UniProtKB/Swiss-Prot annotation:
InterPro entries: Nucleotide-bd_a/b_plait_sf, PABP-dom, PABP_1234, PABP_HYD_C, PABP_RRM1, RBD_domain_sf, RRM2_I_PABPs, RRM_dom. Residues 488-567 form the PABC domain. Binds the poly(A) tail of mRNA. Appears to be an important mediator of the multiple roles of the poly(A) tail in mRNA biogenesis, stability and translation. In the nucleus, involved in both mRNA cleavage and polyadenylation. Is also required for efficient mRNA export to the cytoplasm. Acts in concert with a poly(A)-specific nuclease (PAN) to affect poly(A) tail shortening, which may occur concomitantly with either nucleocytoplasmic mRNA transport or translational initiation. It holds the Pfam family RRM_1. It is found in: Cytoplasm; Nucleus. One of its GO terms (biological process) is nuclear-transcribed mRNA poly(A) tail shortening. This is Polyadenylate-binding protein, cytoplasmic and nuclear. GO terms for molecular function: molecular condensate scaffold activity; mRNA 3'-UTR binding; poly(A) binding; poly(U) RNA binding; promoter-specific chromatin binding; ribonuclease inhibitor activity. Keywords: Cytoplasm, mRNA processing, mRNA transport, Nucleus, Repeat, RNA-binding, Translation regulation, Transport. Belongs to the polyadenylate-binding protein type-1 family.
Length: 585
């Protein structure tokens, strides 16, 4: 056993996260990878993929020096990509050849050489753009199509948030000459019965510059709200007085009927600009025309997005500090009763109790006042006040993403505190100082995980019948890689084991919380249920994370216990309020 422990500790010491530096190259040179080792970028990863899983996949290829899954600095959630570094350069091409597009947790990964220098990544030499791709074409099939022209550094089909192809992609060749050969051969070719367009990739900055140039010198005009009885001659006569027209088209459907819009192209920009200025919103044959610069579809979508975002921000600013969130409402409270409860504190612009699809109250609602001062007064007076036998919770309404960010920051702060304790204990042990490492307890949602619930509770599997959570029974955790690898020397024996338990508990808790929150959509409930489940032995928690059915069973039991706990709290609060009222009488 001691030999195994020593070997594991030795592996952990060797497996440290190191940043690989790229060699200096000139503009004329193709970026080269390091010859002393191999650094790979692994993308398209499922959010729960860990360093340990990647180690299991890549270690058979060669000796792994480090693995790092990149994570959000605040939420610690995976960003969907990682870096894998090998000691030997030969392992890099071998990993790309054998593992590229391998399924990892149901998603094909994308592997390419890591290029640390951003200027070389953004230079774009040898990078081509392909559009009008068939939805069935994925990264692998695109790579197979273009690999015949030369060595490919990266290949990617753009997808939406659901993983569905957006119809375009990019292929980055090592040599620019290979990219030009690919363009010449594939542009206009049929791929899955669709003709594709292939060209050198143009950077966003250059595209924006060209777009601004087109805007400044446009000659093509878009016209809509055209009367169905308008003839081609009338259409041309309307615009012809502003300058020479090179083309004028009234769009028609398959039956030859006008679709209500058309295009007019002038010979020069001045004529087009004058037509837009004078004819936009002009009434023609009883309809108000829209006349503007003709835009491509992506331009219109961008403008619509900007308008939507501006309207959203304006709405948020309008309700900032005046909209209240009220929860723990009794089922008997409707919109009118909610408004009556808050009417004494000021002018109410709206009051709404949220309901499900069957019309039943969801137990919370919103009250909007005319001024922030009125809203603040209502919070002071109504928060925790008993209404219809229930203590209300009243606070300023926040968007869901704001609440999540605040919770993530709180978790991050607790994590940093634990790390500080761990580092202090490690430093003391290295210096030979006496003392015992005692990590601070980790509570989710502000409740200790072993709070006993009063009354008969639904029993969770493997828990004692008194309703209290069992004591922690962490076994020795297995090797940890990347972000879990210890840095430097750590306390030995019991202190070392305690440190590993703390790190393991943190990692499991963060993964478990995400799954529980997805089920509850409630920060408080998710935190407390996570705390209850997390107190099970680590191996059992790992099984829950890997088995959704088993997790659902434990979640339902913990959720029932949590609901009972909440009901008991509310009953106690109501009894206390009634006793206080009797005392006053």
């Amino acid at each position: 056993m001691s030999d195994i422990t020593d070997k594991t500790a030795e592996q952990l010491e060797q497996l440290k996260i190191e940043e690989q530096t790229a060699p200096t190259t000139t503009e004329s040179e193709t970026p080269k990878v390091e010859t002393s080792g191999a650094s790979l970028y692994v993308g398209e990863l499922e959010p729960t993929v860990s360093e340990a899983l990647l180690y299991d996949i890549f270690s058979p290829i060669g000796s792994v020096s480090s693995i790092r899954v990149c994570r959000d600095a605040i939420t610690n959630t995976s960003l969907g990509y990682a870096y894998v570094n090998f000691h030997d350069h030969e392992a890099g091409p071998k990993a790309i050849e054998q593992l590229n597009y391998t399924l990892i947790k149901g998603k094909p990964c994308r592997i390419m050489w890591s290029q640390r220098d951003p200027s070389l990544r953004k230079k774009g030499s040898g990078n081509i753009y392909i559009k009008n791709l068939h939805p069935a074409i994925d990264n692998k099939s695109l790579h197979e199509t273009f690999s015949t022209f030369g060595n490919i550094l990266s290949c990617k089909v753009a997808t939406d948030e659901n993983g569905v192809s957006r119809g375009f992609g990019f292929v980055h060749f090592e040599n620019e000459s290979d990219a030009r050969d690919a363009i010449e051969a594939v542009d206009g070719m049929l791929m899955n019965d669709q003709e594709v367009y292939v060209a050198l990739h143009v950077s966003k900055k250059d595209r924006q510059s060209k777009l601004e140039e087109v805007k400044a010198k446009f000659t093509n005009v878009y016209v809509k709200n055209i009367d169905q009885e308008t003839s081609q001659e009338e259409f041309e006569e309307l615009f012809g007085k502003y300058g020479k027209i090179t083309s004028a088209v009234l769009e028609k459907d398959s039956e030859g009927k006008l679709r209500g819009f058309g295009f007019v192209n002038f010979e020069d920009h001045a004529a087009a600009a004058k037509a837009v200025d004078e004819l936009n919103e002009l009434e023609f044959k009883g309809q108000k025309l829209y006349v503007g610069r003709a835009q491509k579809k992506y331009e219109r979508l961008q403008e619509l997005k900007k308008q939507y975002e501006a309207a959203r921000l304006e709405k948020l600013a309008k309700y900032q500090g005046v909209n209240l969130f009220v929860k723990n409402l009794d089922d008997s409270i409707d919109d009118e009763k909610l408004k009556e409860e808050f009417a004494p504190f000021g002018t109410i612009t709206s009051a709404k109790v949220m309901r499900d699809e069957t019309g039943n109250s969801r137990g919370f609602g919103f009250v909007c006042f005319s001024t922030p001062e009125e809203a603040t007064k209502a919070i002071t007076e109504k928060n925790q006040q008993i209404v219809a036998g229930k203590p209300l919770y009243v606070a300023i309404a926040q968007r869901k993403e704001v609440r999540r960010n605040q919770l993530a920051q709180q978790i991050q702060a607790r994590n940093q505190m634990r790390f500080q304790h761990a580092n202090a204990a490690a430093a003391a042990a290295v210096a030979g100082l006496p003392g015992q490492f005692m990590p601070p307890p980790m509570y989710y949602g502000g409740i200790p995980p072993r709070v006993p619930f009063q009354g008969p509770n639904p029993q969770m599997a493997g828990m004692p019948k008194n309703g209290a959570m069992p004591p922690q029974q962490f076994g020795r955790p297995g090797p940890m890689y990347g972000g879990f690898a210890p840095q430097g020397q750590f306390p030995r024996n019991g202190q070392q084991q305690q440190f590993y338990q703390q790190k393991q508990r943190q990692a499991l808790g963060e993964q478990l919380y995400q799954k529980v929150f997805a089920k509850t959509q409630d920060d408080e409930a998710a935190g407390k249920i996570t705390g209850m489940i997390l107190d099970l032995p680590p191996q059992q928690v790992i099984q829950l994370l890997e088995n959704d059915e088993l997790l659902e069973q434990h979640f339902q039991e913990a959720h029932a216990a949590y609901q009972k706990f909440k009901e008991d709290q509310e009953a106690q609060a109501a009894a206390a309020a009634a006793a206080a009222a009797d005392a006053r009488e």
